[in-house]
Amino acid sequence: MSNPATKIEILYPEYGNQGGDNGNALYLEACLPKENFVYTSHATTPYFVENTPSAIIMGGMTEAQQELIISRLMPYKDRLAELADQGVPMLFAGNASELFGEKIVNPDGSEIEALGLFKFTTTRYMPQRFHDVQVGEFDPGNGKEPFVVVGFKMQFTLTEGDNSNCYFLKNKVGFGINKESKLEGFRRKNAIATWLIG
């Protein structure tokens, strides 16, 4: 039996479904009753603004939707940082992760200010696309044994930033945040930004 106090917030499910990345939410929905989920759409104030959710999840989207969601979340970026520092689990997968860096650079050199939860810059290289299979080790850092995570990456972007002390995975197979890196994603306590999908 589930605890009705458990509230998992799915941010912008109408957008966060690129590459089937809404599968993270669908899996949780198959495991827990509907009462455990809160869905924030573009027309509503996020649940996390006035409440502390049990977890926050968002999947990948189009570039135009990225910019729309940044504008929607910008007034609440300090609250997101506060929740991350409190240890609230968050998973931003695929290009949803890019919303939480410092900026996104377009192919024409123009820049989009991002939410700043993590210290990285993302550069868009459209129409060039980067694909990769990922096999990496995740260390929960809580005294439990590290375990292997397998996934796939499909993106128009590469990222610059120092994640040597805050990475999500140490890859055995596949590139990390860019082609020179083996360290995938960023982590701030239990908040994870990763380009992995699937």
Predicted regions and their residues:
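Pocket-forming structural segment of enzyme catalytic cores
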Residues: P107-G185
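Glycine-rich beta-alpha junction loops
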Residues: Y12-E14, F156-L158, G198
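Short coil/turn connectors at secondary-structure junctions
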Residues: N3, T52-P53, Q86-V88, S110-E113, ...
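RNA-binding accessory domains that recognize and position tRNA/RNA substrates
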Residues: M1-A5, I10, T123-Q128, G136, ...
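A glycine-centered loop/beta-turn motif at secondary-structure junctions
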Residues: N178-G198
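Structural motif
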Residues: A55-G59, L91, A193-W195
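N-terminal beta1-alpha1 cap of cysteine-dependent amidohydrolase-like domains
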Residues: M1-D85
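Cysteine-nucleophile active-site neighborhood
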Residues: T62-P140
